[in-house]
Amino acid sequence: MKRKILLVDGYNMTAFWRETRPFFHRGELDAARTILLQKLSNYASFEGLEVICVFDAQYMPGVRQTYEEFNVTVVFTEEEETADDYIERLAAELNTPKNQVSVATSDLNEQWTVFAQGALRVPARELEKRVAVTKSDLNKLSGQINLQRPPLRPMDSQSLRDLQKMMEKKDDL
C-alpha cells in the first residue's frame, strides 16, 4: 500500500479557509496556523495521511525550521525561499512508486507544476470541504460511543463457570 503524503501550502490555506481567513487578514498568523494545524491533524489521523505543512519565511523572516505540532510536520522555509519552491522540490523528491503525493494549494501555477511531476493537486476549498466532512464523520462516530453505558457482551460459558467458582470460593472464606 502506498504511503499517502499531503503537502500543504500553509499560508495559502489560511488565506482561503473560512475559519482561518479573518485571523490571516488581521495579521494574527499564530492563531491562523494553530487552527489550520489542528484541523489538518484530525484529518490526517482519520484518513491515514502524513501531512507536511509549509509556511513561507516572508511572514517570519530568519526562522527556517522544521518541527512536529499536532502530528503534522511544520516547515518554515529559508528567508529567500517560497513555500511554492520548497513544495515543488519536496514533491519531486517524495513522488516515488511507494508514495502517493498530494499538494494542497489554490495557486494555479503551483498546481500545474506539481501535477506535471505526478503529484495530485487539491485546491484550498476542496481540502477545506474534505476536512469538514471528516470532522462530521468523527462527530457521528463519537456520538455513537456511549462511555456511560458501554455495550454489554454476553459472557461465554467458560468465563461464567470460572466466575461461579471464584464466587463459591469467596463464600467459603
Language model feature labels by segment:
Residues R3-V8, N12-L173:
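Nuclease catalytic cores that cleave nucleic-acid phosphodiester bonds
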